[in-house]
């Protein structure tokens, strides 16, 4: 999963993808999933996103996985500051696990995370995972995500720009590919599509799209 690439990005602090406020789409539309506030939300490839703090503030439980220890250390420092959370840590199956009753954080390769380790989740919040992966990995990512989560409902944000205008990441994933990746397991609803400030993002004519995915079975 391009370990060296992402480790280097974090070591060099080249994290322009990190947002310093919670995702506006998350804040405005997450209630479309119709979840109880005690629901457990999975955040794959989480980085140190402030979206996790927002989810916790709403009363949700969170489980996240991130490859970079640097990112997770920063995330934990922020959570300790914001919520006075103290974590217990353990290690199993190549993954470091930080546990608190309201949040679990795993450090390591997403593909090493098992269904048993993840536990039951009610929904998946994917703002930056799918679009961080090149096309030769995305199908495997989606399949593993479905397997370990039991096809939990998804709040998925994709990103699209003109072909050839940027190499990625973030990678451009269009509506046709979203359907190819998810249609077998999910009913797919396009909820919101918006243009993105090109000066702040990669690629020509960038736009973000919010999808709600609901399991067919």
From Swiss-Prot:
Q: Give one GO biological process term.
A: methylation
**Domain of life from the UniProt record:** Bacteria
**Matching CDD domains:** AdoMet_MTases
GO CC annotation terms, alphabetical: cytoplasm
What EC identifiers does the entry list?
Answer: 2.1.1.67
* Pfam families, A to Z: TPMT
Name its cellular compartments: Cytoplasm
Q: Which reaction does it catalyse?
A: S-adenosyl-L-methionine + a thiopurine = S-adenosyl-L-homocysteine + a thiopurine S-methylether
Q: Which UniProt keywords apply?
A: Cytoplasm, Methyltransferase, S-adenosyl-L-methionine, Transferase
- Top EC class of this enzyme: transferase
InterPro entries from the xrefs? SAM-dependent_MTases_sf (IPR029063), Thiopur_S-MeTfrase_Se/Te_detox (IPR022474), Thiopurine_S-MeTrfase (IPR025835), TPMT (IPR008854)
| Alphabetical list of SUPFAM superfamilies matching this protein | S-adenosyl-L-methionine-dependent methyltransferases
Any GO molecular function: thiopurine S-methyltransferase activity
Indicate which residues the UniProt annotation says bind S-adenosyl-L-methionine: 10, 45, 66, 127
Classification via PANTHER family: THIOPURINE S-METHYLTRANSFERASE
- Stated family: Belongs to the class I-like SAM-binding methyltransferase superfamily. TPMT family.
Q: What is the protein named?
A: Thiopurine S-methyltransferase
Q: What is the lineage of its organism?
A: Bacteria, Pseudomonadati, Pseudomonadota, Gammaproteobacteria, Moraxellales
Gene that encodes it: tpm
